[in-house]
């Protein structure tokens, strides 16, 4: 999703691979996968970002990055 990252590709690829493997292990359909990932994002923001304004700004940035990643280039 991100065009630039402060994380190494190896670290990102390993984490992404693990998350995908879990969803595949549970044979989660698209809607269940999106629900679970959405809940994870919500929990990450609620547990790690102090103010509502910051959470909303990050959620908006995340949403925009997701939408941009779906555009055909």
From Swiss-Prot:
InterPro entries per UniProt: UPF0352, YejL_sf
Descriptive protein name: UPF0352 protein APJL_0577
Entries under SUPFAM superfamilies matching the protein: YejL-like
Any one Pfam family match given in the protein's UniProt record, by short name: DUF1414
HAMAP family attached to this UniProt entry: UPF0352
Transmembrane segments: none
Top-rank lineage group of the source organism: Bacteria
Family to which this protein belongs: Belongs to the UPF0352 family.
